[in-house]
A protein has these predicted regions:
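Alpha-helical scaffold/interaction cores of sigma-54-like transcription cofactors
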Residues: 2-772
Length: 772
C-alpha cells in the first residue's frame, strides 16, 4: 500500500474543529471522498486528528496508516443504524476495534435491517469503549453509553435554523458537517454517481463537503456556542486508539501470520517425517543421493528457523486430499517448484534438483518473505477444494477476500454525460477512441496532457485532435470536471477470485468481515494488501482449464488402452513429442499456440525439454528480443562467452542469462555470494534504482576477486552486462512447471491424436485439420 506524505501547511494555525462524521468511498454509493484526498485535505488545514465513520471498517487500516504517516491522529469509527436512528461509534481504544470486528456480521445486518442495540448483543461493558455521536439521544443509548454519548449538531442545519440552538445542552454536543465529498463543487459528481448505480438514488445534499474552521468557527463564535467545536477536541483527547508499536512492520506481521495459522500437532517433526517419507519414495529419481539429502536437510533447517512448517503442512493436506479425491493439481506455479520440500510433500510435481531450480528464489533468509504458494487445480472442481477447506476448518476459519472496483476514466465520462443529458452520439465516439487506442486504465491526467506519449505514439492524429478538442471545449467543462472527480472512486465490492484466508482461530478475532449474499461465503472487509499488513495467511486456489483438459485426456486414453494412464509419468525426452514442437504443430497446446511462438519453434528446432522451457521464458515482453540470439547461438553450436566460469549454468540457454535463477547462481560463482545474497542482488538489479545499483556494483566488484575467476575490472564489465538481463529475467521454476503441462499435452496429441482431437472439441468448436 502506498503511504504518501503530504505537504505540511505554512502559517496556518492548528484547526479548532475536528470532523467526526466522514464517510469515504468505501461506503459505496454514499460517498465519493477517497481516503488519501481526505487525509491530504486535513493536513492542508493543519488538523491534528481526523475521523472515519464508514458503514464498515473496510478503510480503517488504510486510513490509520495514512494518518499516522502524516502526523494526524486517526479516529476509527463506524456508522450504524439502530432502529430508526443512526449513530457514529468512535473507537476509544483497541478493544473497541476488536468489538466491532467480533460483531461485524451483525452490524452488516443492522445497516440492512435496522435493529435495537440490545439485539446486536453489544453489552453495556462493550459500550464503555466507544464514544457515541447521534442526532437522537434515546433512553436506550443514554443507558448504554452514559457520559460517552454526544448529541450531533448538524452545521448546515443550524446555519439555516439558528433557533435550534435554543435550549440545547451543549455540554455533551458536538458540531459536525457530514462529509460525503471533498469540495462544494463535487456535489454534482456524487449526484451523478448515485444516479448511475440506482434507479431511485438517495438524496444528495449540497452541504456535505469538507467544511473547516474558516466557516464553522466564526459561525459558532457569533452564536456563542464555540464549545461545540471545543467538544470535538475534547472527544479527540479521549481517543486512545492505537495499534501496538511495530504492529504493521513485516517481522511483526509475519509473527502474527505464523500464530494465526491452523495448528498441526508437533509441526516440525511431522513435516520432517512426511518429507523423509517422500524422499524414500522418490529415491530412484536422484542422481546424487547425498546431494539430495543435503538439500532436504538445508531446506528443513531454513523452514524450521523461520517457523513456517504449518504453511507446508497446510498445503500438503490440501493437495493430498485432492489426489485422494481425483482432483487434478498442477505441477507448480511461481517460485514454489524451486523448493525440494514442496516436491517431496507432493505440493509441487517438479524435481528442482533435476531442473537446476533455486530454493532461495522461493524462500530467502536475507529478505522478509513467507511461503507464498499459488497452486492450480482442475477448474471444474475448484469449488470442491474450497468447500473441503471450509468443512475441515470451519466457515469462520476459511474466508474469502474483498476486492474493490474503481471507476476508470471512460466510465466516469459516461456517468457524467448521462447526468448532464448528453446524447449517445456526443459521447460514444469519444469513449470509442479511448477504448480503441488507450489502455483501459489510462488516466485523465494523460488524456488532458497534449504532450503525452498517447498523442505522439498511440492515438492516430485526427482521433487525437478530436479527443483533445472535446476535452478542452468550454461547453464540456462541467462534464470533464465531474468525470475527473469520479476517477478512481470505488463503485463495487466483489470477491477476490482465488484468495482465501485460513486461520486457526475464528476470523472475527482478527478482522472485520461481511457475508456475500449470493455465495454465502464470509469475506474479509480488507483487501489482500491490507491483510498482509495485518498478518493473515492468504492461500491462492487457482482454477486452470488445462488441468480439466488433462484429466479428460487421461480418462479417454485409459479407456482406449484398457490400462490406467498417468500423464505425470510421461518421459520428458520423447523424440516424437519434441519433433512436433520443432515443426510448430502447437495449436491447442498450452502456452505454445501463438503464431509467433510457432514460427520461432521452427527456427529453434528444440531437441530437449530445456529448449521448450527457454522458449516459454523468452516469448513474452522484455526477453522477446533475445529469441533470435538464442536461435543463432543454438544453430552455431558455439557462442561468445561474456561470463567466465558460468558456462555450465548458461549452457541450457546458449550463453544468455535468461532465468532469474541464473542471475542468482552467477553472483555465487563470480563474486562468492550465497544464493540468498544472489537473490537480493537480482532483485536490486531488476528495480534499477541508480543509487542502489551503484552500491551493489561496488560490492560486486569488491567481492569478485576473492573467487579468482575474474578481476575487479572484469567484474565491473560483467555487472553492467548482467543488468539488462536481470531486468527481464524470468522465473525458471514457473517456466519449467508450465512447460511441463504443455509437454504432457503435446505427448498425448502426438501419441493419441484421436482422443486428443475429441477432447479438444469440448474446448473449442473449430479445429485446424493440418495440425493433426
Amino acid at each position: 500500500m502506498d503511504l504518501y506524505t503530504f505537504d505540511s501547511p505554512e502559517g496556518i494555525p492548528e484547526s479548532k474543529y475536528i470532523p467526526l462524521d466522514i464517510m469515504s468511498d468505501y461506503s459505496i454509493g454514499e460517498s465519493i471522498a477517497r481516503i488519501p484526498e481526505l487525509v491530504r485535505k486535513a493536513k492542508s488545514l493543519n488538523m491534528k486528528a481526523l475521523a472515519l465513520t464508514d458503514r464498515t471498517l473496510s478503510g480503517a487500516i488504510e486510513f490509520y496508516l495514512l494518518c499516522k504517516t502524516n502526523d494526524i491522529k486517526p479516529i476509527i469509527g463506524q456508522k450504524i443504524a439502530f432502529g430508526n436512528n443512526e449513530v457514529n461509534l468512535l473507537c476509544k481504544d483497541l478493544e473497541a476495534y476488536k468489538i466491532l470486528c467480533r460483531h461485524s456480521l451483525e452490524l452488516q445486518d443492522a445497516n440492512d435491517f435496522p435493529m435495537a442495540l440490545s439485539e446486536l448483543r453489544i453489552t453495556k461493558e462493550d459500550c464503555e469503549h466507544f464514544i457515541c455521536i447521534t442526532s437522537y439521544c434515546t433512553s436506550e443509548l443514554l443507558t448504554s453509553f452514559g457520559d460517552n454519548l454526544y448529541r450531533q449538531v448538524d452545521f448546515a442545519d443550524v446555519k439555516n435554523h439558528p433557533e435550534k440552538f435554543d435550549n440545547l445542552d451543549t455540554s455533551h454536543a458536538v458540531i459536525t458537517n457530514p462529509v460525503r465529498y471533498l469540495e462544494k463543487e463535487d456535489y454534482a459528481a456524487l449526484a451523478a454517481f448515485k444516479q448511475s448505480i440506482s434507479e431511485n438514488p438517495s438524496p444528495t445534499y449540497p452541504d456535505n463537503y469538507f467544511a473547516d474552521d474558516s466557516e464553522i468557527i466564526p459561525f459558532l463564535t457569533e452564536n456563542n456556542h464555540l464549545e461545540l467545536a471545543e467538544n470535538t477536541q475534547r472527544i479527540t483527547e479521549q481517543i486512545q486508539f492505537i495499534f501496538p508499536e511495530n504492529y504493521f512492520t513485516t517481522p511483526e506481521a509475519h509473527n502474527r501470520m505464523r500464530e494465526s495459522l491452523p495448528d498441526f500437532e508437533d509441526a516440525e517433526n511431522q513435516l520432517r517425517a512426511i518429507a523423509v517419507e517422500g524422499f524414500e519414495q522418490k529415491l530412484n529419481e536422484f542422481d546424487n543421493e547425498q546431494e539430495a539429502w543435503d538439500r532436504l536437510a538445508y531446506e528443513l533447517e531454513d523452514i524450521g528457523n523461520h517457523h513456517w512448517e504449518k504453511v507446508f503442512l497446510f498445503h500438503h493436506e490440501v493437495t493430498s486430499w485432492c489426489r485422494q479425491n481425483g482432483i487434478e493439481v498442477g505441477p507448480g506455479r511461481g517460485s514454489a517448484p524451486g523448493s525440494f520440500v514442496s516436491y517431496l510433500l507432493g505440493i509441487t510435481n517438479v524435481n528442482p534438483l533435476k531442473h537446476g531450480l533455486v530454493y532461495e528464489r522461493f524462500l530467502n533468509s536475507e529478505r522478509l518473505c513467507y511461503p507464498d504458494f499459488d497452486i492450480d487445480y482442475d477448474y471444474e472442481r475448484l469449488p470442491e477444494v474450497a468447500e473441503h477447506l471450509k468443512e475441515k476448518y470451519g466457515e469462520d476459519f476459511v474466508v474469502r477476500i474483498a476486492t474493490y472496483g474503481r471507476l476508470k476514466c471512460w466510465q466516469t465520462l459516461e456517468i457524467a454525460a448521462k447526468y448532464l443529458n448528453y446524447s449517445a452520439e456526443e459521447i460514444l465516439p469519444i469513449k470509442k477512441i479511448i477504448l480503441d487506442f488507450c489502455l483501459p486504465r489510462v488516466t485523465f491526467s494523460r488524456l488532458l496532457d497534449s504532450s503525452s506519449y498517447l498523442y505522439k505514439d498511440v492515438i492516430p492524429h485526427w482521433d487525437g485532435v478530436k479527443l483533445q478538442g472535446f476535452l478542452r471545449d468550454k461547453k464540456n467543462e462541467k462534464l470533464v470536471k465531474i468525470a475527473q472527480t469520479l476517477e478512481f472512486v470505488k463503485h463495487n465490492i466483489g470477491l477476490y477470485a482465488s484468495g482465501y484466508i485460513v486461520t486457526g482461530d475464528s476470523i472475527y478475532t482478527y478482522i472485520p468481515v461481511l457475508k456475500d449474499s449470493k455465495t454465502g461465503w464470509i469475506y474479509s472487509e480488507y483487501t489482500m494488501n491490507i491483510l498482509e499488513d495485518v498478518g493473515l495467511y492468504k492461500s491462492d486456489l487457482l482454477g486452470l482449464w488445462e488441468l480439466t483438459k488433462l484429466k479428460q485426456l487421461t480418462e479417454a486414453i485409459s479407456k482406449k488402452t484398457g490400462t490406467p494412464f498417468n500423464y505425470k509419468e510421461i518421459p520428458l525426452e520423447d523424440k516424437e513429442t519434441l519433433e512436433a514442437f520443432a515443426k510448430g504443430k502447437t495449436t491447442d497446446v498450452f502456452q505454445f499456440e501463438a503464431p509467433g511462438m510457432k514460427k520461432f519453434l521452427k527456427k529453434l528446432e528444440p531437441d530437449r525439454f530445456s529448449d521448450l522451457v527457454l522458449m516459454n521464458a523468452l516469448y513474452r515482453p522484455g526477453p522477446f528480443d533475445y529469441i533470435p540470439i538464442a536461435i543463432d547461438n543454438k544453430a552455431a553450436g558455439n557462442y561468445r562467452n561474456d561470463f567466465p566460469g558460468c558456462e555450465s549454468i548458461l549452457e541450457e540457454t546458449y550463453g544468455l542469462p535468461i532465468y532469474q535463477e541464473q542471475i542468482i547462481q552467477m553472483a555465487q560463482i563470480l563474486a562468492g555470494y550465497s544464493l540468498a545474497e544472489g537473490d537480493m542482488l537480482r532483485r536490486a538489479m531488476g528495480k534499477k534504482k541508480l543509487e542502489v545499483l551503484m552500491a551493489k556494483k561496488a560490492e560486486f566488484m569488491e567481492r569478485a576477486p576473492v573467487t579468482e575467476i575474474v578481476s575487479e575490472k572484469q567484474a565491473e564489465e560483467i555487472f553492467d552486462i548482467m543488468i539488462p538481463f536481470a531486468g527481464y529475467a524470468f522465473n525458471k521454476s514457473h517456466a519449467v512447471a508450465y512447460t511441463m503441462m504443455a509437454y504432457w499435452e503435446m505427448y498425448m496429441k502426438v501419441h493419441f491424436p484421436k482422443e486428443y482431437r475429441k477432447i479438444i472439441k469440448n474446448f473449442r468448436e473449430e479445429l485446424e485439420e493440418e495440425d493433426f
